[in-house]
Amino acid sequence: MIFAVLQAKDALGRKPTINPDLLDIKANYLDCNDMFWLAIDENDRVVGCIGCSRITDTDQAFLHRLYIKPSLKRKGIGSKLLNTAELWMRENGIAVSKVHLGTPKEQWFESYVFYPKHGYIEYEPRYMMKVL
């Protein structure tokens, strides 16, 4: 995962911060009955990831940390990760998937294009959702 962060630094032209939840995926996702997936290449290297956290006392969940290695974007990896997360949500009684998009919009333009292609609609500024 650290390697992926370093590659993100090169692609973004700035050093991304490590979100605390990524430092202990087991405690922050798996032990909470949430989920986190990694996309692995043929050399067993992480090339992408996505996380999902339930919203307490609802049938909704938030997606987090969708990341694809920059040199592997537009090869369907992000779509496969998203489809995997959405399938898990459906199988676990989650009816609505939500995602928070970063700002400024120009910096996160890929997210603002990616999610609508997969049926997500904006319901508040910087937030999108999809009924599963």
What are the functions of these language-model segments?
Residues 58, 76, 110:
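Residues that form or flank phosphate/diphosphate-binding pockets in enzymes
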Residues 65-68, 74-87, 91, 113, ...:
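Conserved acetyl-CoA-binding loop-helix of GNAT-fold acetyltransferases
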